[in-house]
């Protein structure tokens, strides 16, 4: 029992509830015994004030703009690490040694192929199907192809499933893209790094030699790092909730992908890019700023503000730098969308309206420009998000399975429907 406690009083009933402290961050009130003591539940739509679990993986301080993975700042990981190193960190809790990194890279690399029957599985989808619809179906179907790693009580099978998904997700994502545009699938090339392999599978064709640009590969790798995990967001909570029932890991990740597909979650970078295109030029920005400030105008600035961050999203600063590097490498330094983005950012950081409402640029503000420059259509943006977030989902799922306090998720509700009433025969209604 915690030494600290909180007392909740309602009418003549009160409850003494333990207060739990994490290693950093705010304390939480443990309400597990609230109903037993008071016959009341709590009401928190959207879980804005509710901690659903303990976790050692990711920490966010939204007020200060801090994002830590296993204690390491995202800025340091993105600057000095690579994606598979971050994957190892999220899964195992520590940065790997040189030998551990080489072994982990090898194990991931040699799971990149998918079962050959998967290629025929794709033909069941329409050619114009959204790639995210294809991703949901294919990832969910992995349990039918790899049922030797679905026993969640076996730590070895859990780790094999984890490595398989990290390795195969780029292959499946590239296959979804190729199927969507009518080009033949490109098999993985295991002497390439993770990001380079993915870019090659997306953009190579059999009739031409494709050489991956190292600047673009590094940018892709950094995008993967920045999207690897973000604590208990909607899709991660979905993965945990599905996993709490004992569902196999492939089904849980498919559930996360489905949740991520929602425009309020994974589609924000596409919306931000569309907004920049709608504004078009710098001289039109004042008009749209006025619209954004008008509460009666439906227009909203996309790529600004965040559910958690009330300060500058630390990932946005890294993404801004990456965007400049990509556009410079491709000879698009004067890209009009970037000019609009830079001026919008300047205004948001100096205008009292945006400062007061804490509407700072977030990662989606720049990632859409970068992905467009890399050659991806907007329909692939959320697919890339899902690819990168897979390791975070897996790490969170594994942590949940190993948590002795975890039980099947069963939220309560505030019922506002009809009270008890008697059935009336249809002839008398």
UniProtKB/Swiss-Prot annotation:
InterPro entries: Citrate_synth-like_lrg_a-sub, Citrate_synth-like_sm_a-sub, Citrate_synthase, Citrate_synthase_AS, Citrate_synthase_bac-typ, Citrate_synthase_sf, Citrate_synthase_typ-I. It comes from the Bacteria. It comes from Rhizobium meliloti (strain 1021) (Ensifer meliloti). Its EC number is 2.3.3.16. Keywords: Transferase, Tricarboxylic acid cycle. The active site is at 306, 364. GO terms for cellular component: cytoplasm. Belongs to the citrate synthase family. Pfam families: Citrate_synt (PF00285). The keyword Transferase applies. It catalyses: oxaloacetate + acetyl-CoA + H2O = citrate + CoA + H(+). PROSITE patterns: CITRATE_SYNTHASE. GO terms for molecular function: citrate (Si)-synthase activity. One of its GO terms (biological process) is tricarboxylic acid cycle. This is Citrate synthase. Pathway: Carbohydrate metabolism; tricarboxylic acid cycle; isocitrate from oxaloacetate: step 1/2.
């Amino acid at each position: 029992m915690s030494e600290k406690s909180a007392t909740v009083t309602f009418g003549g009933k009160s409850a003494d509830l333990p207060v739990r402290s994490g290693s950093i961050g705010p304390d939480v009130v443990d309400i597990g015994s609230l109903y037993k003591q008071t016959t009341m539940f709590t009401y928190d739509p959207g879980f804005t004030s509710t901690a659903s679990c303990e976790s050692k993986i990711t920490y966010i301080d939204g007020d200060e703009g801090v994002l830590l993975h296993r204690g390491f700042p995202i800025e340091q990981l993105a600057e000095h690490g690579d994606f598979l190193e971050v994957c190892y960190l999220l899964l195992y809790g520590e940065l790997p040694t040189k030998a551990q990194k080489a072994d982990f890279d090898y194990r991931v690399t040699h799971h990149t192929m998918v079962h050959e029957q998967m290629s025929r599985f794709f033909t069941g989808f329409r050619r114009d199907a959204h790639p995210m619809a294809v991703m949901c179906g294919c990832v969910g179907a992995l349990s039918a192809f790899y049922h030797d790693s679905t026993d969640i009580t076996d730590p070895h099978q859990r780790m094999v499933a984890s490595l398989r998904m990290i390795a195969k997700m780029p292959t499946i994502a590239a296959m979804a893209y190729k199927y969507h545009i009518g080009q033949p699938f490109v098999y993985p090339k295991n002497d390439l790094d993770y990001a380079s392999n993915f870019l090659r599978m997306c953009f190579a064709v059999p009739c031409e030699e494709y050489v991956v640009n190292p600047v673009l590969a590094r940018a892709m790798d950094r995008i993967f790092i920045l999207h690897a995990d973000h604590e208990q967001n909607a899709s991660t909570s979905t993965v945990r909730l599905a996993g709490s029932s004992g569902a196999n890991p492939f089904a849980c990740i498919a559930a996360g992908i489905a949740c991520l597909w929602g425009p309020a979650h994974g589609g924000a970078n596409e919306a931000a890019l569309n907004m920049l295109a709608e504004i078009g030029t710098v001289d039109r920005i004042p008009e749209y700023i006025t619209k954004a400030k008008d509460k009666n105008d439906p227009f909203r600035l996309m790529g600004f503000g965040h559910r958690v961050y009330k300060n500058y999203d630390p990932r946005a600063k890294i993404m801004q730098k990456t965007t400049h590097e990509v556009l410079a490498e491709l000879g698009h330094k004067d890209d009009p969308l970037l000019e609009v983005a830079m001026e919008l950012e300047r205004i948001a950081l100096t205008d009292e309206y945006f400062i007061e409402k804490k509407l700072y640029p977030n990662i989606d503000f720049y990632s859409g420009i970068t992905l467009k420059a890399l050659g991806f259509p907007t329909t692939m943006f959320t697919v890339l998000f899902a690819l990168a977030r897979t390791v975070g989902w897996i790490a969170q799922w594994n942590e949940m399975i190993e948590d002795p306090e975890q039980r099947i998720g069963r939220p309560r509700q505030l019922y506002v429907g009809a009270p008890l009433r008697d059935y009336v025969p249809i002839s008398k209604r």
